[in-house]
């Protein structure tokens, strides 16, 4: 069974570049080696940030590829856990991971480290390098 993953925006930005050492993570998604769990809030952030770091066309194409992929699962978290207090915007990823029963969130953001200290609900966070190692298994 495929692992279910929530990708923080900073990691999505790193894996989509054709010249990135993390590009295999994007290709693994396209090949169905993991399921990407997203919400409308997450897709909106992906679009906003991709438009800023690349352009509107790239943002549109990447978000469309995610939406249309059979390896994407959409979730609509109705309950907001508020587990990350330092950056409330990060909670959209946590809420999606909980509702999706995701195996983990992939993030390089230090704010997510607080989740290691919260016993319930348990949310695992992996760095991009750890995720890459998982994909090689």
Describe each PLM feature range.
Residues 59-67:
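Short, well-structured alpha-helical segments
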Residues 71-105, 110, 114:
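Active-site neighborhoods of divalent-metal-dependent phosphate/nucleic-acid chemistry enzymes
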Residues 7, 17-51:
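PIN/NYN-family metal-dependent endoribonuclease catalytic core
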Residues 2-4:
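Extreme N-terminal starter segment of soluble prokaryotic enzymes
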Residues 28, 96, 117:
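Hydrophobic/aromatic ligand-binding patch that stacks against planar heteroaromatic rings
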Residues 11-12, 42, 111-112:
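Alpha-helix capping/helix-boundary segments
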Residues 110-137:
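Acidic, PIN/NYN-like endoribonuclease modules and their adjacent C-terminal/linker elements
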């Amino acid at each position: 069974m495929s692992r279910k993953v929530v990708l923080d925006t900073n990691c999505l930005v790193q894996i989509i570049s054709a010249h990135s050492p993390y590009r295999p993570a994007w290709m693994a998604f396209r090949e169905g080696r993991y399921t990407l769990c997203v919400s409308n809030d997450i897709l909106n952030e992906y679009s906003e940030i991709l438009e800023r770091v690349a352009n509107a066309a790239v943002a549109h194409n990447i978000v469309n590829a995610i939406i249309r992929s059979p390896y994407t699962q959409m979730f609509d978290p109705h309950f907001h856990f508020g587990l990350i207090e330092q950056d409330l915007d990060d909670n959209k990823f946590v809420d999606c991971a909980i509702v999706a029963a995701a195996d983990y969130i992939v993030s390089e953001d230090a704010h997510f480290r607080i989740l290691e200290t919260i016993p319930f609900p348990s949310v695992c966070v992996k760095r991009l390098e750890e995720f890459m190692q998982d994909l090689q298994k």
